[in-house]
Amino acid sequence: MGVEELERKILEDAEKEAEEILEEAKRDAERIREKAEREAEEVRREILDRARREAETRRRREIAQAKLEIRQERLRVKEEYIEKAIERAEEKIRELAEEGRKEYLEFLKRSAIEAVNAISSDEVVLRANENDLMLLDEMLSEIRDETGKDVELGEPVEAVGGVIAESKDGSEAYDNTVDARLRRRRSEIVRRVSETLFGG
């Protein structure tokens, strides 16, 4: 083999090797590009998933907060109307009492008899506000006759209306004032207000 042939052979081999290196580099570059795209897609999906999860969490939190606020507002409104209902009832009773209306006199007598009968003792003391004590004084004999008990009047108390019955020895008491009756009926008032405002 001559010198020229040897040179050509060397050049051909070098070119061939260079082409192979170039092809390998291209393949490596393609693999790197594909890997980078895959990783970029994974990162993109992860970011979107995280954003969706955070948005859903935030949405649920906002819904829960809104529901809580609605519930609190309903309770506030309900409580406000319950208080108004009780205040109106008390005011109505005050008006009836001040006017000396027949309805109130009947209510007071019934309250007194009910309270006296709730005491097991035969000697009972009735207490009420000053105005009601004067009214009770006029109906005391009727209360005694209807209950068959020795009933007397005691010291005045702070109350919208109605009576408190106590055994003479102080061992028993039954609060039948308007305030106490309204407290006992509070659950019924709450139910009625709830039905009126919220349908149940």
From Swiss-Prot:
InterPro entries: ATP_synth_B-like_membr_sf, ATPase_E_C, ATPase_V1_Esu
Keyword Kinase attached: no
Keywords for this protein: ATP synthesis, Cell membrane, Hydrogen ion transport, Ion transport, Membrane, Transport
Pfam families to which the protein is assigned, alphabetical: vATP-synt_E
Gene Ontology biological process: proton motive force-driven plasma membrane ATP synthesis
Membrane topology, as annotated: Peripheral membrane protein
Keyword NADP: no
GO molecular function, one term: proton-transporting ATPase activity, rotational mechanism
Gene3D superfamilies found in the cross-reference section: ATP synthase, E subunit, C-terminal, F1F0 ATP synthase subunit B, membrane domain
Annotated compartments: Cell membrane
GO cellular component, one term: plasma membrane
Assembly with partners or alone: Has multiple subunits with at least A(3), B(3), C, D, E, F, H, I and proteolipid K(x).
Family to which the UniProt record says this protein belongs: Belongs to the V-ATPase E subunit family.
Main function: Component of the A-type ATP synthase that produces ATP from ADP in the presence of a proton gradient across the membrane.
PANTHER family for this protein: ATPASE H+-TRANSPORTING V1 SUBUNIT E1A-RELATED
Protein name: A-type ATP synthase subunit E
Species annotation: Methanopyrus kandleri (strain AV19 / DSM 6324 / JCM 9639 / NBRC 100938)
Lineage summary: Archaea, Methanobacteriati, Methanobacteriota, Methanomada group, Methanopyri
